[in-house]
Regions:
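Membrane-core helix-loop-helix motifs of multi-pass transport proteins
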Residues: 137-237, 408-450
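Membrane-embedded alpha-helical segments and adjacent helix-loop junctions characteristic
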Residues: 40-141, 290-378
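Helix-coil boundary and interhelical linker segments in multi-pass alpha-helical membrane proteins
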Residues: 374-386, 449-450
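Structural signature of hydrophobic alpha-helical transmembrane segments
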Residues: 1-4, 55, 126-128, 203, ...
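Alpha-helical transmembrane segments of multi-pass membrane proteins
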Residues: 95-118, 143-160, 186-197, 341-355, ...
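Hydrophobic transmembrane alpha-helices of multi-pass small-molecule transporters
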Residues: 1-63, 199-318, 434-438, 442-450
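Hydrophobic transmembrane alpha-helices of multi-pass, membrane-embedded glycosylation machinery
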Residues: 9-10, 26-33, 131-136, 156, ...
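Membrane-helix interface "capping/anchor" motifs
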Residues: 13-24, 140-149, 284-291, 354-365
Length: 450
């Protein structure tokens, strides 16, 4: 009985039974270690040693959560939302078919741009969704925009950006987690252009988005005008000064990331940029000193769960590596597939989809599958670029369609603010169909051609 298979199966089963993911990862690692004959002490030591590998990533998430709340406190999201509402309201008054169509596409483009920027230029991740989307629901109702389409647009911007561009959250996914864990598993990635490698799988996401916009959800859908559930949240009053200082903080945060990244420094530009951005918000008075603790704590709390899951996943991966059961599993899989790379690649992508669906986070999936897939890809003679594409795609698969992923939960949090959007039917299923199917195909093609 292979300890790696048992560990992953136990973890997935518990996660699907809605046991907390952190607990599921810990119990799965414990089961794998015991099956491997490591004993309680050796298993715990391996798990504990792996926890440190996720600490920097978790800290990055916490600081970005604080930065997101600081941006929200400045009133910048409210300005963006109010500007969109005014312009769209003005257009909606002249409701000719052509104006409605143009306005709808402008709204879609605006939401897509914001979701892309939330991963790098304004690194707030999903925090912008409950701030920006609920005020726009009334306008969407007038335009009869299908909210399933908006869920697909939001998910595309969140997932495709971090899996392709190594800036902001993309740096965490591509460099701090993907390349770092692949190198830790023994594969040399020196000189590989990660954007070129992940660009092919990203084309699958683009295809899914185009199908969602122009085929699946192009027809009007009726919604009622209902009040936002829970009433309106007290929002800051935006001022010109706050707007200017917010833009300064955002530009500084983004610029520092780029400078550190392209200077060849090994320092973490995301951590440094976030700290500088937070400092600007504090020193400028946009975030008042007596409220800073509450603002930053609420932001860190928002990202804390994701951080803990990432730390636990690194511990799980460490137990997998120490079990000495990866090599027998690789040998068994190689014997089953022979040297049929096409079938092996498809199987690895499907397994990655299942694991991500169970955990709910592609960021947390990568350390686990990298420990298993790197030796497997080497044994099947996949190139280093093909291996990276396979593991990166296998990790991203499922994030778009997992009921527990932050991408789908964030989309639903905004779109269901008036009670007319179902999480499973209107977010999970549409994003799963439109992204996981073409992403699987594009990832398979990347593995075959790279």
């Amino acid at each position: 009985m292979n300890a790696v298979v048992i560990a992953v199966a136990v973890m997935l089963l518990l996660a699907l039974l809605r046991v907390h993911v952190v607990i599921a990862l810990f119990i799965g690692a414990l089961a794998g270690g015991l099956i491997a004959g490591m004993g309680i002490e050796a298993t715990m030591l391996a798990f504990q040693s792996g926890l440190g590998d996720g600490a920097k990533i978790a800290l990055s998430y916490a600081l970005l959560g604080a930065f997101a709340m600081a941006v929200a406190a400045s009133g910048l999201p409210k300005i963006l939302a109010d500007t969109l509402i005014r312009r769209l309201d003005a257009d909606a008054e002249h409701a000719s078919a052509k104006v409605v169509k143009v306005t709808s596409y402008l709204l879609i483009a605006g939401i897509l741009a914001m979701s892309i920027m939330s991963q790098n230029i304004i690194p707030v991740h999903i925090a912008f969704i409950p701030l920006l989307i609920p005020p726009l629901l009334t306008v969407m109702n007038r335009l009869q925009l299908d909210r399933r389409l908006i869920a697909c647009v939001l998910t595309f911007g969140l997932v495709t950006t971090y899996m392709t561009l190594p800036v902001g959250f993309g740096k965490i996914f591509l460099e701090d987690i993907l390349l770092s864990n692949i190198e830790r598993a023994g594969l040399d990635t020196e000189g590989i252009n990660i954007v070129q490698v992940m660009g092919i799988p990203a084309m699958g996401m683009v295809l899914g988005l185009l199908v969602a916009i122009f085929v699946s959800y192009r027809k009007p859908r009726q919604y009622e005008d209902r009040p936002i559930m829970g009433g309106t949240v007290a929002e800051p009053t935006p001022t010109r000064y706050n707007l200017i200082m917010s833009l300064v903080a955002i530009v500084a945060t983004f610029a520092i990331q780029l400078i550190v990244q392209f200077s060849g420094s090994e320092a973490d530009g995301l951590l440094l940029g976030s700290l500088v951005g937070l400092g600007i918000f504090l020193i400028s008075g946009v975030v008042e000193w007596n409220k800073a603790d509450d603002v930053f704590t609420s932001g860190m709390r928002m990202m804390a769960l994701i951080g803990f899951v990432m730390i636990s996943a690194q511990g799980f991966a460490a137990v997998i590596n120490e079990s000495n059961h990866v090599e027998p599993l690789v040998a068994a899989v190689q014997q089953f597939f022979g040297y049929n790379q096409a079938m092996a690649a498809l199987a690895m992508l499907i397994v990655g989809l299942i694991v991500t669906m169970g955990i709910g986070s592609s960021f947390s999936t990568l350390p686990i599958i990298a420990a298993i897939y790197v030796p497997l890809c080497v044994s099947l003679d996949f190139s280093a670029m093909a291996t990276i594409a396979l593991i990166g795609t296998a990790g991203a698969l499922g994030d778009a369609g997992s009921p527990a992923s932050d991408s789908t939960l964030g989309s639903t949090a905004g779109l269901a603010a008036d009670g007319q959007h179902d999480h499973m039917r209107d977010t999970v299923i549409p994003t799963f169909i439109h992204y996981n199917i073409p992403l699987t195909g594009a990832g398979w093609i990347a593995a075959m051609v790279l």
